[in-house]
Amino acid sequence: MSLPEKAFPVSWDQFHRDARALAWRLAGTNGRWQAIVCITRGGLVPAAVIARELGIRLIETVCIASYHDYSEQGELKVLKEISPSLLEEDGQNILIVDDLTDTGKTAAIVRAMMPKAHFATVYAKPKGRPLVDTFVTEVSQDTWIYFPWDLGFSYQKPIADGEIG
């Protein structure tokens, strides 16, 4: 798989710095969050960093699959729902975390589940930007972000796809 013309490879160090920067921004909002709901899988890593930095102990997940072949967004499917107890009060005092908002389709589904929650992503593209309350870096819509969990020295298919190496 070759990198697209506008590739943005992100190292583990850079992602950690950006996730901590997001935590700093969130700390400045004076939010008193009782829990984080992270959108899996991309939200897992920033949620762990943010939970540590802000002292949040409860992390819940919602799983919405959108990238089925690592290149294009497909049909959105909710694979795991949010715990009903966190849906009370429409997500008031809940922090939703993801790595990226791209088209905003995933964000819109989660926002509909928790309209009063605070939505934070590390990166935002213009189409998804209106659905996010806090983010760190905006990238152009035609940029493909390569996250460190997708990369070795080059893009690596997941082991489950049958190729090791």
Swiss-Prot record:
Can you tell me which residues bind Mg(2+)? 99
Q: Which reaction does it catalyse?
A: GMP + diphosphate = guanine + 5-phospho-alpha-D-ribose 1-diphosphate; XMP + diphosphate = xanthine + 5-phospho-alpha-D-ribose 1-diphosphate; IMP + diphosphate = hypoxanthine + 5-phospho-alpha-D-ribose 1-diphosphate
Cellular component GO terms held in the UniProt record = plasma membrane
The record lists the membrane-crossing segments as none
| UniProt keyword list | Cell inner membrane, Cell membrane, Glycosyltransferase, Magnesium, Membrane, Metal-binding, Purine salvage, Transferase
Q: Name one GO biological process term.
A: GMP salvage
Q: Which cofactor does it need?
A: Mg(2+)
Subcellular location field: Cell inner membrane
Task: Family membership, please give it.
Answer: Belongs to the purine/pyrimidine phosphoribosyltransferase family. XGPT subfamily.
Subunit structure comment from the entry: Homotetramer.
Query: Which protein is depicted?
Result: Xanthine-guanine phosphoribosyltransferase
Which species is the source of this protein? Chelativorans sp. (strain BNC1)
